[in-house]
């Protein structure tokens, strides 16, 4: 997921996507603890995707304030 894809979405879509990605990250942590996660690098990717979504949300709010 790239930032350019995210900046075109509405705030509602971004918040729904953020909620879904946080749930996915939780599932990955559970799988890691249960030794069922085949690729631990997926946690890093999920965290970075969450950060990208948060950046897009913050950019939306900062542009609406100005």
Curated annotation (Swiss-Prot):
<dbReference type="InterPro" id="IPR001854">
    <property type="entry name" value="Ribosomal_uL29"/>
</dbReference>
<dbReference type="GO" id="GO:0006412">
    <property type="term" value="P:translation"/>
</dbReference>
<protein>
    <recommendedName>
        <fullName>Large ribosomal subunit protein uL29</fullName>
    </recommendedName>
</protein>
<keyword id="KW-0687">Ribonucleoprotein</keyword>
<comment type="similarity">
    <text>Belongs to the universal ribosomal protein uL29 family.</text>
</comment>
<dbReference type="GO" id="GO:0022625">
    <property type="term" value="C:cytosolic large ribosomal subunit"/>
</dbReference>
<dbReference type="InterPro" id="IPR050063">
    <property type="entry name" value="Ribosomal_protein_uL29"/>
</dbReference>
<dbReference type="GO" id="GO:0003735">
    <property type="term" value="F:structural constituent of ribosome"/>
</dbReference>
<dbReference type="InterPro" id="IPR036049">
    <property type="entry name" value="Ribosomal_uL29_sf"/>
</dbReference>
<dbReference type="InterPro" id="IPR018254">
    <property type="entry name" value="Ribosomal_uL29_CS"/>
</dbReference>
<dbReference type="Pfam" id="PF00831">
    <property type="entry name" value="Ribosomal_L29"/>
</dbReference>
<keyword id="KW-0689">Ribosomal protein</keyword>
């Amino acid at each position: 997921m790239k930032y350019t894809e995210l900046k075109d979405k509405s705030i509602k879509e971004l918040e729904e996507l953020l909620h879904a990605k946080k749930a996915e990250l939780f599932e990955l942590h559970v799988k890691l603890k249960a030794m069922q996660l085949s690729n631990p690098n997926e946690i890093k990717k999920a965290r970075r995707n969450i950060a990208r979504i948060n950046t897009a949300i913050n950019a939306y709010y900062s542009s609406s304030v100005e």
